[in-house]
């Protein structure tokens, strides 16, 4: 039976993305979101690197002690006693000690023999265990390490007190069949030890290698939100979570929360999400070709591996020269506009003859319909109104207390503390404009609220 969980390394590996820096507050917010998502472990950073990382981990550990965060908190460390001491004084749940074990790393980086490396690994793991924490050893460049020596390294780590060993594909050169073979052999040769995979994505094979590692016996997959990390990053959390659900039937995180976490990290990292990114990109459940749209309208399974609602998304399709009658008719029906077959043919002909328009918006379709029919058309009002309310708090109030008050107002669906000109973002839903106004007034009347800004949601992808 397959057993697998996710270690999220957005706060450690993810911050090693060129140009990415998280503030202390952002680190804490991301950690809370990851815990709510349900990841097994959060690699909160390498505290010896800088004071802000140290402070971020300190606050994250405090939230863990208070029960607000439930994931296991991991502190990163070199195989250096001072690093271990710094991580241990923060009272993290686990210290992850890394050391390059390939002959290349031993010679070029550590200037050490294999025997010296084994001694360092054993001594530092034992030292960390003496501080009363769980220990993971990371075999850096493990994928390019002689197998027999990798087995010796793993046994040395286990015997010194590590309960996990992470095999790092540091330069992303593994391929799936080799990965499965490697982990199958390691789990066979080194009993009483669990293995992680830390797969870099240099050849675009990180997700495939992670799945293969699971088949080989790995029980923890290292991932980052949006695939952040050194160079081109590591396993993207949203992709591996979806793949594990599809292929193994295991829900390692709350899939419907992936979109929120992805957007949060996109905002704080400053790395934009490509529209064609799997699962959380704008185009992930957006269909274009007429044949595809017709199939989806008849049975979404024809062109969707899982329903978008699983991931908190909705499906849609574009209208352009590739569009067929099924899509166009469905679009007008959703707009509440009646169009005859003959009129539909004329509208479709106009759309196909104009090759310069990439997307026809709803307003464009209404204008085309009015041009063809000669009628003034009014679209059907939306079944419900969604809005985002930006809230600015008084300077002398605790933002979290205002957040709690807002969360119990009828019609409020989600409340988020944010950075920038406003302090809180509130997602609301109302059946009509009157109800929306009542919700807004309730928000404005909440103690600690200074001002609000309302933005209506026009369309969701």
UniProtKB/Swiss-Prot annotation:
GO biological process, one term: L-leucine biosynthetic process
Domain of life: Archaea
MF terms (GO), sorted A to Z: 2-isopropylmalate synthase activity; homocitrate synthase activity; metal ion binding
Binding-site residues, Mg(2+): 13, 198, 200
Record keywords: Amino-acid biosynthesis, Lysine biosynthesis, Magnesium, Manganese, Metal-binding, Transferase
PROSITE patterns named in the record: AIPM_HOMOCIT_SYNTH_2, PYR_CT
Record: residues binding 2-oxoglutarate: 12, 76, 136, 170
Reactions mediated catalytically: acetyl-CoA + 2-oxoglutarate + H2O = (2R)-homocitrate + CoA + H(+)
NCBIfam families the record matches: LysS_fung_arch, PRK00915.1-2
EC category: transferase
Domain annotation Pyruvate carboxyltransferase: ranges: 4-259
Family per similarity comment: Belongs to the alpha-IPM synthase/homocitrate synthase family. Homocitrate synthase LYS20/LYS21 subfamily.
Protein name per Swiss-Prot or TrEMBL: Homocitrate synthase
CDD domains, per the entry: DRE_TIM_IPMS (cd07940)
E.C. number(s) listed in UniProt: 2.3.3.14
Active site: 292
Pathway assigned in UniProt: Amino-acid biosynthesis; L-lysine biosynthesis via AAA pathway; L-alpha-aminoadipate from 2-oxoglutarate: step 1/5
Gene3D superfamilies: 1.10.238.260, 3.30.70.920, Aldolase class I
InterPro entries with a match to the protein in the record: 2-IPM_HCS-like, AIPM/Hcit_synth_CS, Aldolase_TIM, Dimeric_a/b-barrel, Homocitrate_synth, LeuA/HCS_post-cat, PYR_CT, Tscrpt_reg_AsnC/Lrp_C
Chain's role: Catalyzes the aldol-type condensation of 2-oxoglutarate with acetyl-CoA to yield homocitrate. Carries out the first step of the alpha-aminoadipate (AAA) lysine biosynthesis pathway.
